[in-house]
A protein has these predicted regions:
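Short, solvent-exposed loop/turn elements at beta->coil junctions and helix N-caps
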Residues: 37, 191-192
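GST-like domain detector, emphasizing the conserved glutathione-binding G-site
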Residues: 1-119
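Generic structural signal for secondary-structure transition and capping sites
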Residues: 75, 102, 140, 184-185
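Non-transmembrane alpha-helical segments in soluble domains
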Residues: 67, 71, 91-94, 132, ...
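Short, hydrophobic secondary-structure boundary micro-motifs
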Residues: 77-82, 106, 165-166, 186-191
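Conserved residues at the C-terminal ends of beta-strands
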Residues: 55, 150, 191
Length: 192
């Protein structure tokens, strides 16, 4: 199997960290989605990364679905409970972190078009702020939700260095600083 992804995709980074933690070899094929490469469109007609191409040629798309596949590939994995409250806590935390990424990417696309202010932009910043406040209360381990939170805030630091998320979220800062120093995160750091 191989992961079609861009080097700076935070969604792909989440999957690369998960694979690393699970001991899964996950080759990455650097893919530029805006170029509509044939391999990506064959795997995901939406033209979005990441996409996981399996050995039989079939594909799994969307980072939460790929994450679920990776977790299911390792019986007895310790990154997420298979059922019960712990499972749903991790999935909900993953959704919050992915929502932060969604809002941040909307802001990046808007900035590329010169849109840096207005109700839609303000709404994205408010969504990020609210989600971070909740994530600040949900972190503390090293499971799926924790990984997703660290990826999200590291992406904010990477793409929005002037955004002051750290001063309001001390638990999230401590959590991210701890996880970002681990081998899985160091190995998947995006290029500058």
């Amino acid at each position: 199997m191989k992961l079609l992804a861009s080097a700076t995709s935070p969604y792909a980074r989440k999957l690369r960290v998960i694979a690393h933690e699970l001991g899964i070899a996950l080759p990455v094929e650097d893919t530029t989605p805006m170029a509509d490469p044939a391999a990506l469109l064959a795997a995901n007609p939406l033209g979005k990364v990441p996409a996981l191409v399996l050995d039989d040629g079939s594909a799994i798309i969307d980072s939460p679905v790929i994450a679920a596949f990776l977790l299911a590939s390792v019986p007895g994995q310790q990154l997420m409970a298979n059922s019960g409250p712990g499972h749903w806590h991790a999935r909900t935390t993953e959704a919050l972190a992915d929502g932060v990424l969604d809002a941040a990417i909307i802001l990046r696309f808007n900035m590329a078009q010169g849109i840096t202010a207005g109700p839609w932009v303000d709404r994205q910043y408010r969504a990020i702020e609210r989600a971070l406040a909740v994530m600040n209360t949900r972190v503390g381990g090293s499971g799926l939700g924790d990984i997703c939170c660290a990826v999200a805030v590291d992406y904010l630091s990477f793409r929005f260095p002037d955004l002051d998320w750290r001063s309001h979220n001390p638990a999230l800062v401590a959590h991210a600083d701890r996880l970002l120093a681990t081998p899985a995160f160091v190995a998947t750091r995006p290029p500058a």
